[in-house]
């Protein structure tokens, strides 16, 4: 069991900022992520992927270059979903790499597992192959959100989905 000045639950934007800022102030910091990858919803399924898909579509369709090259200009004639997801995945993977490098550079300990409180200053982290416990003076809970799904809309993940 290690003791930290700050333990953070969640590696999304809020958790990242809390952990990095505390580390920059000389604090001993650890961060826990339930998923097998850092970044939270913003990086992996929300903001960055949706904006990357949008920008890939605009780029491949030649939308921004049409004023220069004419209305029929396209970077690629037939745009496939594979073309779009390739670019989005590249951006996502780069963001994940940046986050991991920030944690390493600032000496933030990172664990993948599910955190639960034993008491206000002690966490149990259930990992794939074991359990560990750590204590902290301060624990920040930054475990993110789930997009709303209004009951009057049929979310079938084909014609209606969320990011």
Which positions does each model-derived feature cover?
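Short alpha-helical segment within the catalytic ATP-binding CA
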Residues: 17
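The conserved SAM/SAH-binding core of class I Rossmann-like methyltransferase domains
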Residues: 9, 32-33
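Beta1/beta-strand and adjacent pyrophosphate-binding region of the FAD-binding site
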Residues: 1-14
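Glycine-rich flavin
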Residues: 2-4, 20-27, 33-163
């Amino acid at each position: 069991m290690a003791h930290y000045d700050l333990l953070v639950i969640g590696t999304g934007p809020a958790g990242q900022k809390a952990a990095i800022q505390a580390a920059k102030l000389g604090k001993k910091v650890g961060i826990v992520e339930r998923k097998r990858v850092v970044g939270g919803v913003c990086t992996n399924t929300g903001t960055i992927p949706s904006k990357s898909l949008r920008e890939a579509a605009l780029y491949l369709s030649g939308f921004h270059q049409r004023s220069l090259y004419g209305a029929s200009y396209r970077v690629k004639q037939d745009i496939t979903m594979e073309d779009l997801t390739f670019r989005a995945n590249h951006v996502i993977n780069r963001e994940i790499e940046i986050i991991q490098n920030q944690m390493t550079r600032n000496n933030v300990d990172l664990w993948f597992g599910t955190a639960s409180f034993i008491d206000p200053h002690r966490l149990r982290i259930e990992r794939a192959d074991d359990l560990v416990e750590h204590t902290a003076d301060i624990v920040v809970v930054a475990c993110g959100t789930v997009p709303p799904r209004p009951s009057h809309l049929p979310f079938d993940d084909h014609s209606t989905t969320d990011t």
